[in-house]
Amino acid sequence: YYVDNQPVVGERRIDGAWYYFNESGIMATGITVQTDRPDKVYYYDEDGKMHYGWKELDGKQYYFHPTLGVMLKGAERNIDGVWYYFNEDGVMATGWTNHHNHTYYYQNDGHMTYGEKYIDGYWYYFHERTGVMATGWAKHHDHTYYYQSNGHMYYGEKHLGNYWYYFKKGIGVMATGWTVQSEKPGKQYYYNDRGQMQYGWQAIGNDAYYFDKVYGVMKPYTFKNSNGYWLAYDRNGNLVKDLRSAFNNESSYVIKVNKPMNTVTVYMQYGDGSYTVPLVAFICSTGASTPTGTFYTPDKWRWLRMMGPSWGQWVTQISGDYLFHSVYYNSTNNNNSLSVSAYNNLG
């Protein structure tokens, strides 16, 4: 192209269209890098006109700025209300893509993915506004989820911070309230509204429940308040009178002796610190010499030599020479040394 008999070099607007002529005056077609703009790429059609918008080259999609004609490279672009990403070579991204320190997923048509997406056997979540792949905690569809560092939805138990959480199998929803883990049928757990596993005594509704202090499994009892005491009922609604097998490692107990009734009741501690949960009650021998008052047990023995000589098992000192102990045995460390008369006596 000549002007005043001189070849045009560089860009030139002719009849409303932009053209580019190299240093020899040859009109550019196809992919072109202008001499004075080495970091920018353009595309000129076969007739030399600058191209704008979408262009497929060798089976790949590119996009050229709608007014400047510059190829988009290493950038996001909202085109007709849809977000796309073009890599450093200007190729429209599809599939997994990392940029701006985040991970995204673009569909086959280049559209950015939002929300939940099932990809190659795993569920992922992409932020509804930004399209960023979720890792860690995420809330959507009125539920809470947890995604691993690779974006995979997490299922099952997980220890996060100082708490155990449970994410339901198959759907990944964080558990709250009463929960039976699919991996542990028959065992009940309770998670608060933040999803944290609960331990020990928990008041739920009008009743109370006890959850293992280490594993969080609910003991199979419902405790109901009766005149200030928490009585245990089994799953069939029957009153449970002996809880020793379920609560055998408490740190402290209160033992109350009812002298007129010749009974001993052992209480364990409730969640508020009061000793108001009957553990077990049994008959005992009492008399005028049985001391009254409040005592703290100073010592205990597995076997202890007593009068006779005879031997007592599971001996706890109450005060001075007053003890709680089994019926007497004729020798130590021998459960077979129990006499008939001793068997018929209360220790």
Which ranges hold each PLM region?
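Extracellular adhesion/carbohydrate-binding repeat motifs centered on closely spaced tryptophans
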Residues: 1-251, 308
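Gly/Pro-biased beta-strand-loop elements
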Residues: 243-335
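Active-site scaffold segments
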Residues: 23, 46, 88, 314-317, ...
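Glycine-rich, flexible loop segments associated with nucleotide phosphate handling
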Residues: 40, 275-280, 341-347
